[in-house]
Amino acid sequence: MKASSGDQGSPPCFLRFPRPVRVVSGAEAELKCVVLGEPPPVVVWEKGGQQLAASERLSFPADGAEHGLLLTAALPTDAGVYVCRARNAAGEAYAAAAVTVLEPPASDPELQPAERPLPSPGSGEGAPVFLTGPRSQWVLRGAEVVLTCRAGGLPEPTLYWEKDGMALDEVWDSSHFALQPGRAEDGPGASLALRILAARLPDSGVYVCHARNAHGHAQAGALLQVHQPPESPPADPDEAPAPVVEPLKCAPKTFWVNEGKHAKFRCYVMGKPEPEIEWHWEGRPLLPDRRRLMYRDRDGGFVLKVLYCQAKDRGLYVCAARNSAGQTLSAVQLHVKEPRLRFTRPLQDVEGREHGIAVLECKVPNSRIPTAWFREDQRLLPCRKYEQIEEGTVRRLIIHRLKADDDGIYLCEMRGRVRTVANVTVKGPILKRLPRKLDVLEGENAVLLVETLEAGVEGRWSRDGEELPVICQSSSGHMHALVLPGVTREDAGEVTFSLGNSRTTTLLRVKCVKHSPPGPPILAEMFKGHKNTVLLTWKPPEPAPETPFIYRLERQEVGSEDWIQCFSIEKAGAVEVPGDCVPSEGDYRFRICTVSGHGRSPHVVFHGSAHLVPTARLVAGLEDVQVYDGEDAVFSLDLSTIIQGTWFLNGEELKSNEPEGQVEPGALRYRIEQKGLQHRLILHAVKHQDSGALVGFSCPGVQDSAALTIQESPVHILSPQDRVSLTFTTSERVVLTCELSRVDFPATWYKDGQKVEESELLVVKMDGRKHRLILPEAKVQDSGEFECRTEGVSAFFGVTVQDPPVHIVDPREHVFVHAITSECVMLACEVDREDAPVRWYKDGQEVEESDFVVLENEGPHRRLVLPATQPSDGGEFQCVAGDECAYFTVTITDVSSWIVYPSGKVYVAAVRLERVVLTCELCRPWAEVRWTKDGEEVVESPALLLQKEDTVRRLVLPAVQLEDSGEYLCEIDDESASFTVTVTEPPVRIIYPRDEVTLIAVTLECVVLMCELSREDAPVRWYKDGLEVEESEALVLERDGPRCRLVLPAAQPEDGGEFVCDAGDDSAFFTVTVTAPPERIVHPAARSLDLHFGAPGRVELRCEVAPAGSQVRWYKDGLEVEASDALQLGAEGPTRTLTLPHAQPEDAGEYVCETRHEAITFNVILAEPPVQFLALETTPSPLCVAPGEPVVLSCELSRAGAPVVWSHNGRPVQEGEGLELHAEGPRRVLCIQAAGPAHAGLYTCQSGAAPGAPSLSFTVQVAEPPVRVVAPEAAQTRVRSTPGGDLELVVHLSGPGGPVRWYKDGERLASQGRVQLEQAGARQVLRVQGARSGDAGEYLCDAPQDSRIFLVSVEEPLLVKLVSELTPLTVHEGDDATFRCEVSPPDADVTWLRNGAVVTPGPQVEMAQNGSSRILTLRGCQLGDAGTVTLRAGSTATSARLHVRETELLFLRRLQDVRAEEGQDVCLEVETGRVGAAGAVRWVRGGQPLPHDSRLSMAQDGHIHRLFIHGVILADQGTYGCESHHDRTLARLSVRPRQLRVLRPLEDVTISEGGSATFQLELSQEGVTGEWARGGVQLYPGPKCHIHSDGHRHRLVLNGLGLADSGCVSFTADSLRCAARLIVREVPVTIVRGPHDLEVTEGDTATFECELSQALADVTWEKDGNALTPSPRLRLQALGTRRLLQLRRCGPSDAGTYSCAVGTARAGPVRLTVRERTVAVLSELRSVSAREGDGATFECTVSEVETTGRWELGGRPLRPGARVRIRQEGKKHILVLSELRAEDAGEVRFQAGPAQSLALLEVEALPLQMCRHPPREKTVLVGRRAVLEVTVSRSGGHVCWLREGAELCPGDKYEMRSHGPTHSLVIHDVRPEDQGTYCCQAGQDSTHTRLLVEGN
């Protein structure tokens, strides 16, 4: 048997290859790889072609699929290439890695960190190694640069330099650089220095030194940056020859970009030497920053990229290129389109310290506009790091825990991608961070730069957490560089630069370069030389691949589809494949391909195939097998290859063609298996007589044998296998069972090592294999270790017997006890057993009985009594019983004082008409008190109520008045509680408006500001911008009850500002903005016009606007239009026009003219000429078609897009159901796929649906369909008739009504005599009655378009003959019987009979005909079906006898032993192999038929037979049997006496206090007398206890239950006990009186109070839905049934809704209102005079400490900053202004609530000076504009501009701008005559600039 190649698994595959290792001599080197395969491959390591063996220094660790080579104490001789070779039956694979061993570095302190010592000559073989790498440098232009490197290796490598991937001679001429080889005395290895003479700006870049030898290639790189010196020396005129550089575009072009988008400018410059590039903006040099990137792309172009363009970025950008041969310019004008929807306040740049925070803030036009935050292109989501806040229109981003990577550009974006941009600068040790990500092509150089704050610091470079080699790193001063030359995929990852706790990270991404795979080998040939080998030869691919490659050889067994890898070959040539390389014998084909790092070539298949046979070797031979009697014996061996073999047993060959075999009938059974290389022989259930058998195995080249030895199996324990631990309670039955492997084998029981003795309390039984030890009623002393021991083996049982656990019946919940001193307190606990011990604990310490503590035990009740309590007796008590605890909390109140609450003086502040409640709590409920006010006893009245409730006394003032203020006392004996009540008028509140109001009005519009107060007589004051207003004609103040108004009859722009309506305790704010009149469209008046024009033609849209200078925008179909030759925009005075000189139909649409406030719409409709039908001079003639033919109607219109309407006979035509409508340009087509009569008529094509539109008509005529003969289908039909019978010929036509003629032998027939012609619709019939021989002939049915011929013959019927007779059959009962007989002719009529009766088809009878055969099948024959079967055909007949044999009635499922209890019903059941007749089986007992008994019944259900015994008795037990004629089965019925059982047990009952509980159970027997008990105490009938018994049912009813009645209720009868738990719950607590709304003044105490229905209950207080917990400011108190919540020192945060809850009851919510405390100014501000640059301090003292103040200067709010410091010291508020400026002078205001204080700040200005000068010379192009800009020492200073001494005035030519301290002069449309000297004078200071103009 040959295994197919699909069964060989998978060849080895390397998931991870070993990587080259470079170590220092004496260190440890380790190579690792991961290889998979099926079966798992064998891995060996080789070096120099020799397999390596493990030694002291060399080991091969392996962990699953991971294999390694570990080399300790590496020596130079260990260097070289190590090969990992993996091989299995499916193929082979290998991988190699080089190990380089270097000498340890010399301890030379002068060596640089990047230098490495040269390896010794004996160890230098291998790839080159850089000993010293080049260092990155930052130099000034003109300096000399030297880059050196030194590499080692044998043979000595060749060194060469590259710049930015290009050879040096391709970049420079030879005069600019020099290469200096190193000298031997400089050190070992090859050295090459690159010297650059007079470095230029283009010399900046990455320089890579390559080292290459025969063993490999290495490279090291460095960065060179050349900077412009601060002052460049003047150029030498001799070095300025004619320019040879030409720009790509000479004239500047225009570039538009939307705000927030990127703008990219690219300039491509050629020249030699390489030109220097400078970028300028508006005449000023540009330096790279966060938003301006300057770089050179891969194509050599110079790129300037402006990120996130803003309006300030617009202007002229110039790319200037120069070299020693000349210079050139290229310019572009950048325009930034601003969005219509803009941020009202954009973001501002911010700075922050590392680990600090940064806040970015902007404003959107509308608070409902959604925004999103970005860091460059990364969306920021709200988190702890990025906190995002939205307050109205303000959007704020707070960046927490700043780090270096947070430095960058941040954006806030709203809908429409409208953005505002800001820079976030993070100050820290790292000044210039890494970019977020860096994309580099594979093979290019990657450079990363970092600038640090301090020079000379050492940073750390790492990638994915691993430090990078030192040779890649360089640093100089503040700069740190990482240069990775020729990056590969392995270099990708997260690169981090760390400096202390600061770090910056970038994601380095390497984009792979696509490479072409190598070509395939050529000239592949196969030679079948030696026996069992094949020689394969080939040639290398052409052209040869540039990268290293190998050849992969694969094989395929003929007939299989799978190719399996054989070898991997490094060099071309030949390879010999021996037979040992294949897994099994067969014909094999081979193919080969080339594999490199860039892919795999196509396969080349060797022509032909070779027959290979593997040689088998014995890997693991047979071994003697020794087993126990009855076990399976397994013999196995492993071969080296897959091959068939033969097994022998005692010299007799065993056959392997069946899954299981036997040596001979009844002898040993065996099974032969082969899985891959393993062969197995399994002998099943060997017997003792098989001992000594000899097993042998034989195959080509291998023979082996082994012996079989059988031992008698020892006894062992089947269960339990491990030690068993069992736990029981006392009186419980204990059964320990041990099962042995042998039947009736003796065993001995031991307890705690002592042999046990049987008694009434300990019974030992043996039942077959099982041994049992029984303890009928376990006791505690029965606990111990039990052992069942037999012949050296034992089973152990750990038995623990313990008393049942103790349970606490009452109380089940925590009990709270409140008492006063000297009272007696009793704590009671009930357990479920009277003898159960308990322990009492107080505050964790066990209680001991004494005179002050009494412990009592009474039955199940346990009590702790405190006879005379003291305050120290309070605490937490516990009653511990077993594992359960009952908890009691005792609180003792000291009554040394009558008044419990309040303990001190109470101050109550209220407003008029408020409800005031004064509460005093006493220690005794019966004590009487006396209330006084200001020393006089009060008298109860409707205005003053006195209340008494338990221990609480209250004085209530329902509606307090001002005269109710005073001191109230609650007196009892010598004690009193004092309450000071202060009543004030309620503060004035502004009812409307509650929020700030913003009003926008236009000039001359009437503005009304209204404020509604809570009181009509409350005075108010109006303020505008902080100053109180005065009534005048332009400002009117009105008052109407509580409504106050401020009216501006004709508002002016200067009337805008902030208005305040101040009512003392409250204020309303109004922001008024008065704008210029809106820009409106005054003509035409309609806002939407429909205008009709002819096309082509002139279209002019005109409108008038006001004011005349209003700007408008034109839109078409929603898109803004731009002026062009085809669309002209005009503006003349107030008129605005849009003109289309040559309008086309596509110019139709919606045109909108829009001002800032209004818009008008013009719906332009361009009418086209009417549509006409073309190329039809005459009316189309009618079209006649046959049915089923296609019809195509077409016409051509004068315009392609014109719609048409098709109609048929006046009705519109719908596409579908065989109709298709097409439009092909101007052509319109209607297609009828298959014409029918319904398609005939008049078709009309009309252009459009309008009445009277042009139309074209077509007439279609469809001919009637011909009448065809449908049946019969054959053209000629033969019909046979018998003499005397009727002849009937029938024809069916395709349609009714067709004329048909009948002919016989050419003569026409008519309906007469015996011939009748009939027609019924499409059915035509010819009937000839009493056919005769003369009626035979040819009959023709002739229809108009079709005909049919009938060939009629009249013949006598043929004689029926029996070709074969029936044969007798004998079948078994239930089988089928089939009778078969052949008759002639085949269509003769036959009749079947059984026992003389005609047989008809049915479920059990089938009749069939197959040609001349007649078949009768009788299904499921029964004994009664036996008899004679007859077939009658005409006058002949044949008969056969059917015999049915009875089938043996055997039992498939036999009787089983049954155990039953007296009185139960028992069913005995058997299943027979077939359904027997009634009485086929009989039931017996003890071998005798069953007696007649009403309790016995028998039933049969198909195969199932049952015997029912109802209500078994002890006499029924015995042996029962079921018998048939062929089989018998017996079973034993055992009956045990009836036991008392619980049919329905007791159930737990839970009720409320005072209710009744009913317990009920049902027993298995009647008349049982039992006892009821609760908590172990027997119950007797009484008023609260009712006991009932009714047959099987027993019931207990308990009434009037209390909490103490909870416990265990049980019923006991004989040995039966059933119990359930009674749980009595307290009545739910309710809230009798809930809290009320409160209003307090800020800083006062607020008290909420509620009252419960019970004193012992826990209340939960909540604020705004959140639970409250006690704190120093929040107290929760319980006073009897009252619960108090006190809030001390209330603040605004305490305001809100409060509620209380107890259980499911809730009260509230109620509201707490905290009034703001009035603040007054105690110490006013003082005016300050200072000089510019000095500081000023303002102080103000207010009456309250916790007051927030606001500072303003000149009406502007002040916030802390660099020049503003604000602090608070108690009541004192301080403002410190530093570095004062002249514009800081103004009014200083401090405001704290309604209180404010004013002072003046006077600043003496210093003389105006120049701070920043314009350049001495400025060059501009003709036609552009020039901008000169200066900065003076302060804002607001006046400057004067002069040209050649003459003062310049603003105009079209000169524009003068001022922004803060910056002043600009803009010269428009510069001309040559504008060249000259310009001067700017500021005070006594001045500056000059020479303006140069270039160009024609």
UniProtKB/Swiss-Prot annotation:
UniProt-annotated location(s): Cytoplasm; Cytoplasm, Cytoskeleton, Microtubule organizing center, Centrosome; Cytoplasm, Perinuclear region; Golgi apparatus
Record's keyword annotation contains Cytoplasm: yes
Gene3D superfamilies: Immunoglobulins
GO molecular function, one term: cytoskeletal anchor activity
Fibronectin type-III domain span: 517-615
Region feature (Interaction with TTN): 17-19, 85-94
Expression sites (tissue/organ): Widely expressed, with predominant levels found in the heart.
PROSITE patterns linked: FN3, IG_LIKE
Entry annotated with the keyword Phosphoprotein: yes
Positions of disulphide bridges: C33-C84, C149-C209, C267-C319, C362-C412, C738-C788, C829-C879, C920-C970, C1011-C1061, C1103-C1153, C1195-C1245, C1381-C1522, C1650-C1700
Annotated segments matching region Disordered: 106-127
List of residues that carry Phosphoserine: S10
SMART domains listed in its UniProt record: IG, IGc2
GO annotation, cellular component aspect: 3M complex; centrosome; cytoplasm; cytosol; Golgi apparatus; intercalated disc; M band; perinuclear region of cytoplasm
Keywords attached to this entry: Cytoplasm, Cytoskeleton, Disulfide bond, Dwarfism, Golgi apparatus, Immunoglobulin domain, Phosphoprotein, Repeat
GO term, biological process aspect, one: microtubule cytoskeleton organization
Residues annotated as domain Ig-like: 12-100, 128-225, 243-330, 339-425, 714-800, 804-893, 902-982, 986-1075, 1078-1172, 1174-1261, 1265-1357, 1357-1534, 1628-1720, 1794-1896
Subunit structure: Component of the 3M complex, composed of core components CUL7, CCDC8 and OBSL1. Interacts with CCDC8. Interacts with CUL7; the interaction is direct. Interacts with FBXW8. Interacts (via N-terminal Ig-like domain) with TTN/titin (via C-terminal Ig-like domain); the interaction is direct.
Recorded disease: 3M syndrome 2: An autosomal recessive disorder characterized by severe pre- and postnatal growth retardation, facial dysmorphism, large head circumference, and normal intelligence and endocrine function. Skeletal changes include long slender tubular bones and tall vertebral bodies.
Function (record text): Core component of the 3M complex, a complex required to regulate microtubule dynamics and genome integrity. It is unclear how the 3M complex regulates microtubules, it could act by controlling the level of a microtubule stabilizer. Acts as a regulator of the Cul7-RING(FBXW8) ubiquitin-protein ligase, playing a critical role in the ubiquitin ligase pathway that regulates Golgi morphogenesis and dendrite patterning in brain. Required to localize CUL7 to the Golgi apparatus in neurons.
Protein name, UniProt field: Obscurin-like protein 1
Native source species: Homo sapiens (Human)
